Each structure stands twice: as C-alpha cells, then as structure tokens.
Amino acid sequence: SGAFIGSSYTFATARDWARFGQLYLQDGEWNGERILPEGWVAYTRTLTPHGVANLGYGAQFWLNTGGENRRWPNLPEDLYAMNGHQGQHVFIAPSHDAVIVRVGLSEFDNWRMSDFAADVLAALPAPAAGAGP
C-alpha cells in the first residue's frame, strides 16, 4: 500500500533473482522457515479476476495458462514468470523443480526466452511422476 510503482525498479544479481525464484518454488519457505504468508504463492499463480487465460497474469507474475493458446506453448503449463525490462526473466517451473534466470539486454529480434527455457528444461532430468504443484 502506498507504493507508487509496485512492479518495477528492483535491482538484483542473477544469483539473488534465482534465490527469489527458489523461494517461490518452495512455496514461500526458506531453510524450513516460512518467509511468505501461507497461500501467497498460490495467490500469485491465480489468474486475476478480470484476466484472460491466454494473457495469463496473476499477482505480479505472468502465468502460462490457457491450454493451447497459452503464452509459452512450448513450456509447461504450471510455469510462471517475472519478466523485467530489456530481457530480464525469472521462469519458475514447478513440474521440473527448476528456476531459470536470465539477465541481459537482447537487441536482436530472434531471441526468445521461451525457446531458451525449453532447451534448459529439456537438458534436465525428466520430472518425477506427480512432480509439480
């Protein structure tokens, strides 16, 4: 409350962004201690009341909802992400127990974070049956 801009101007290292993503992947717990309120991560992963599924926006996170029309069709439907200015991304994929961070400026049109993330997820061991939320 009282925040002029709640969506921007957060500066951190790639490692700190990865930790932040890991905190969300772990449902708001860190080293056995609850940091975020119970249910907060589920709330952030819920489509906003007037949201359109394939535009997929939750509470400050982009969602990969909408079935075949989802934002990143080549990525898991449970994936959610923070996308920042000039190519800053934190992708969280619960079904793969993975956080993917990219910080950097992309000045060429053919860079696609979703393709990069799909390649990273494909290189990881297959998710265990029943993995994810």
Language model: regions and residue ranges:
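Active-site-proximal alpha-helical segments within enzyme catalytic domains
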Residues: 8-29, 88-104
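Non-transmembrane alpha-helical segments in soluble domains
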Residues: 18-25, 41, 45, 62, ...
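Structured C-terminal helix/loop/strand segments within mature extracytoplasmic catalytic/sensor domains
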Residues: 79-133
